[in-house]
Amino acid sequence: MESYKVMLNGPAPWGFRLQGGKDFSMPLSISRLTPGGKAAQAGVGVGDWVLYIDGESTGTMTHIEAQNRIRACGDRLCLTLSRAQNHLGKPQKDSLPCSEPPKYNFAPSTALNKTARPFGASSPPNPRPGLVTKPVTYVPLAPACTPQHNGQVSVPDPSPGAAMKTEPGLAPRTPAATPGPTSRPPWAVDPSFAERYAPDKTSTVLSKHSQPATPTPMQNRSSIVQAAQQAPESPGRTPLCYKCNKIIRGRYLVALGHYYHPEEFTCCQCRKVLDEGGFFEEKGSIFCPKCYDTRYAPSCAKCKKKITGEVMHALKMTWHVQCFTCAACKTPIRNRAFYMEEGQPYCERDYEKMFGTKCRGCDFKIDAGDRFLEALGFSWHDTCFVCAICQTNLEGKTFYSKKDKPLCKSHAFSHV
């Protein structure tokens, strides 16, 4: 790993923003640079990993610990970094199978800033194609408003039934298992990841996964969905129907390791024959997809109706996608970042328009913890309130104004 060291002379700001940390399960890295700032002039690049801060390793630091360590440096900051392009060529480990959500350790900074959890205490893995999310935690802008994670979106869709096999003398064949897809971390394959997922945002990354062709054995999960397989009678062996315990003459179904007459393999509620279209098994009972959704599907926190399509997990509750909307523009939030203000969710655009505060000098947001001042009817970072001509810092000093621009005593009557 090629690393380099930079020495920045104070005072702050240093001209960069961080993302990641131990509490995000992501390496600490540079997410944004201020054009012409101290870090940019020193050759620091967006996406570069921060290995050491003043000689102290960042491997065990949380995001807040890293920020506090930088603040404690005073007028001189020494950083050891690794170039971003070095990480792109490294082989990444395969992602987790789609039936298990990725494991992350989240340490929320406020009582409300917590990740949404999947519905139910022991929700069964979804064996069909679905979407897996990777939430990113956010540090709140101000005590009055707390951004939230919007969880995950999943799309249940029962798989079609297996093909009919009626030629005599052929044993039923099981499709070969398809290996699960592999993926690489988004910060390694997407050059724009650092900009889109800066620390002042909350969002989720969605990855499409395919279900292996062979269903997972029943003992490994409490609820499964699969298709009953039809097969002819094997020579020299007479199967018995698992339901009626009678000898099967002719075609039969193989499901859950048992044999059935085709007309006796039915949904336990609506009695629909399940030789095609797939089925669910829950605690020994067999359901068609429709009855399973009706009985076990979660309820929407807004309209209180059952959710049988896309499920939105947010604020520790489940929602229809069309029910969880921005309080201002009424647009479904889906997997985008959102912020909470007075108990109502807002999309990022409307929140910035209605509640956001920007520095008059640099036009960047004033984040929580940033030093700022109010002057000339605007908000300024403490380091951005300077003379419009000579750039002398005017914090705590006498100043003059012309066309809403601050001027020092020496340039009070200069043309702006």
From Swiss-Prot:
Gene Ontology CC terms, in alphabetical order: actin cytoskeleton; actin filament; adherens junction; cortical actin cytoskeleton; cytoplasm; filamentous actin; perinuclear region of cytoplasm; stress fiber
Any Gene Ontology biological process: actin cytoskeleton organization
Low complexity: compositionally biased ranges: 168-181
SUPFAM superfamilies referenced in this protein's UniProt entry, alphabetically: Glucocorticoid receptor-like (DNA-binding domain), PDZ domain-like
Pfam families: LIM (PF00412), PDZ (PF00595)
Compartments (UniProt record): Cytoplasm, Cytoskeleton; Cytoplasm, Myofibril, Sarcomere, Z line
Domain notes: The LIM zinc-binding 2 (LIM 2) interacts with TBX4.
Subunit annotation: Interacts with various PKC isoforms through the LIM zinc-binding domains. Interacts with TPM2. Interacts with TBX4 and TBX5.
Protein name: PDZ and LIM domain protein 7
Chain's gene name: PDLIM7
